[in-house]
Amino acid sequence: MEQILKNLTLDFFGKGKHKISPEKFFKIENGILLDVRSKEEAGSISIKMEYHFNVESINIPINEIPDRIDEIPKEKSVAVFCPANVRSAIVYAYLLSKGFSDVRIVEGGYSALTEALKPDKVLKVSQNEK
């Protein structure tokens, strides 16, 4: 954990190396959207990647991450999501401390995610996959 903290320099944050836009993430091959919201939040607004065949989504509430970490594949690009990026930042650091190397925070919260999942964009993706 010490080394992770030492790497979190102004250069690191200034270049945005810790975050990724939803649009960029959805173009990645073999990605996983890790939704760290509570079960209640995920039940209210669910995020499914049915038409983004290169990306799967999984909801593991932040308080369950330590017990369910084996459900998160280390070989995939992991994008951590929560509405305000507070929980995402905590899980981001935790995953790095557990040996995950390709982890980012989805920037922009709900608004950026819903923008990337608007009907015209989902239609485009679904037509490209057929």
Specify the residue positions occupied by each region the protein language model found.
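Cysteine-dependent PTP/DSP-like catalytic domain, specifically the C-terminal lobe
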Residues: I105-K130
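Catalytic cysteine-centered active loop of the rhodanese-like fold, especially the PTP/DSP P-loop
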Residues: I60-T114
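Short, structured coil segments at secondary-structure junctions
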Residues: E29, F53-V55, G99
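A short alpha/beta connector and helix-capping loop motif
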Residues: I45-N63
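Short, glycine/charged-enriched secondary-structure capping and boundary segments
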Residues: S46-E50, K74, A93-S97, K118-K121
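Flexible, polar/low-complexity N-terminal or interdomain linker segments that lie immediately upstream
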Residues: M1-E50, V122-K130
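Conserved beta-strand scaffold positions in the cores of enzyme catalytic domains, especially
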Residues: K19, L33, N54-N59, V103-I105
